Swiss-Prot record:
This is Cyclic dipyrimidine nucleotide synthase CdnE. Residues 1-25 are annotated as: Disordered. It holds the Pfam family NTP_transf_2. UTP donor binds at residues 53, 59, 201, 220. UTP acceptor binds at residues 51, 67, 124-125, 139, 173. Its EC number is 2.7.7.-. It catalyses: 2 UTP = c-di-UMP + 2 diphosphate; UTP + CTP = cyclic CMP-UMP + 2 diphosphate. Keywords: Antiviral defense, Magnesium, Metal-binding, Nucleotide metabolism, Nucleotide-binding, Nucleotidyltransferase, Transferase. The keyword Nucleotidyltransferase applies. Mg(2+) 1 binds at residue 67. The gene is cdnE02. The keyword Lipid biosynthesis does not apply. Mg(2+) 3 binds at residues 65, 128, 139. Gene3D superfamilies: Beta Polymerase, domain 2.
Length: 295
């Protein structure tokens, strides 16, 4: 029996339930409470906010836990790669006495004091918090202020966040740019961008459940970035099915010839810094296209 793809994509494009939104709000509130209860962290300039699909309202039920960023605003790590000769001194930054390592350890203590030792697991990049009594399922990311300088001026930078995994290295992220660009894309496509993101995410999850291995390496955020890349005119079809097919077709045909970026338009979508590659994406897109045509 063939699938009614128009009705299926209409259903899959809908936002997650109000329960899912409440889940994100509750997680944010409980993480803030944990920080406010910490004698050390409560005195510091810290921002707590959701990021990723829950904030963007593109999450689907099968997405991972709520992603909560805990950012220490007074600690800064800068990327000067675009401005040869730029350094901390020219940026008017001083060596901090309170380090990222101390911050992450203090956050771990605060979370365990709030949710219990068994409710908090320390990962390489984030804390996995599962506390049934508080109804919290969240990935809590300890971050500091990240800056990307574009000119030799202490105020000439793009602000983001930065994390330092336990395994080493530095990762810059751009949550505000992700959010604002996603909002603008949704407006420019007549509110169709987020609909199609959710539809294709659920298509990916459906394929994974059916045993298609090509769907499994494709995370939620990558799907969102891919749909963002598609030009606005490909969202103007007269049906959900047409718009989904337009996006898949465009991405498959253009992926080899393009240096694409994430939604933030700062970080390259492909490269050694990412956990995915173009071959995996092409295989997924081909699987998705073939599945729609054959069913």
């Amino acid at each position: 029996m063939s699938i009614d793809w128009e009705q299926t994509f209409r259903k899959w494009s809908k936002p997650s339930s109000e329960t899912e939104s409440t889940k994100a709000e509750n997680a944010e509130r409980m993480i803030k409470a944990a920080i406010n209860s910490s004698q050390i962290l409560s005195t510091k300039d810290i921002s707590v906010f959701p990021q990723g699909s829950y904030r963007n309202n593109t999450n689907v039920r099968e997405d991972s836990d709520v992603d909560i960023c805990v950012c220490l605003n007074t600690l800064v790590l800068s990327d000067y790669s675009l401005v040869p000769g730029m350094n901390d001194k020219l940026a008017e930054l001083r060596t901090a006495s309170y380090t990222y390592k101390q911050f992450k350890s203090d956050l771990e203590t605060a979370l365990k004091n709030k949710f219990g030792t068994l409710g908090v697991s320390r990962g390489d990049k984030a804390f996995d918090v599962h506390a049934n009594s508080y109804r919290v399922d969240a990935d809590v990311v300890p971050a500091i202020q990240g800056r990307l300088y574009y000119d030799k001026n202490h105020n000439a930078f793009i602000r983001g966040t930065c994390i330092k995994p336990d395994s080493g290295g530095t990762i810059y992220n751009w949550p505000e740019q992700n959010y604002s660009n996603g909002v603008n894309k949704n407006k420019s496509t007549g509110n169709r961008f987020k609909l199609i993101v959710r539809a294709i995410k659920r298509l990916r999850n459906h394929l994974a459940e059916k045993g298609y291995n090509t769907a499994k390496p494709i995370p939620s955020y990558l799907m969102e970035c891919l749909v963002y890349i598609v030009p606005d005119q490909y969202f103007t079809g007269d049906s959900y099915k047409t718009n989904v097919e337009n996006c898949i077709n465009y991405l498959y045909n253009q992926i080899d010839s393009s240096d694409w970026t994430e939604i933030n338009e700062i970080k390259y979508l492909f490269g050694s810094h990412q956990m995915w590659n173009k071959t995996q994406v092409k295989e997924f897109l081909l699987t998705a296209w073939s599945y729609i045509q054959k069913n």
